[in-house]
Amino acid sequence: MRLNLLSRRIDFSNLFLAVLAAVTMLSGCSKFDNSQSALNGPQITAKFFDAQFTDAAGKPVNLAALRGKTVVINFWSTWCPPCVEEMPMFSEAQTAYKDKNVVFVGIAADQADNVKAFLQKTPVNYLIAVGGQPAFELSKALGNRHDAIPYTVMINAKEGVTSRHFGIYTRKDLEADLAKALK
């Protein structure tokens, strides 16, 4: 009888630990909520506008000049197939939303030589900045708690974060998030 009771306690302990682990994992996967996020205001977006990056040719990129616009920031790399897959859609959206004061910025977490060679084969019509490791640091500051790419952040004209997106964008999700950013 005593062995049976001990066995039940061990089973209960294992069940409790399993439930605790599941709750912890699920809470980490919650959807971004603008209303309660500490990663939303100008103090956070200032990190983007103040960042110092260059383009693939080594010329400084003036991100501060984008203040007052709706900015779609996509963190990517040349070695990331999902990143490369969504680039034509971003080029099309840059053209479609240009007159609505929307600017797309791709920040490559890569080396300048790799980005330069990539862009010669796969040109885009939006701003590309080369960030290397500091690109990952900026993406973390903008809410990328998974340190994953592609990762996209939208900042509205009032410098508030309106959406964060992990993984590849669908056209439908991109348009929905742009509509929200332009309100």
Residue spans of the language-model regions?
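Active-site acidic short loop of glycosyltransferases
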Residues: 66-69, 99, 125
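Active-site-proximal beta-strand/loop segments in catalytic clefts of secreted hydrolases
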Residues: 75-76, 107-110, 131-132, 168
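Surface-exposed loop and edge beta-strand positions of immunoglobulin-like domains
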Residues: 54, 64, 105-107, 166
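N-terminal targeting signals for export/organelle localization
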Residues: 1-50, 54, 163, 179, ...
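Thiol/disulfide oxidoreductase modules built on the thioredoxin-like
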Residues: 120-124, 131-179
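Short active-site neighborhood of thiol/selenol oxidoreductases, capturing the structured segment around
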Residues: 62-81
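Structural microenvironment flanking redox-active thiols in thiol-disulfide oxidoreductases
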Residues: 84-123, 133-139
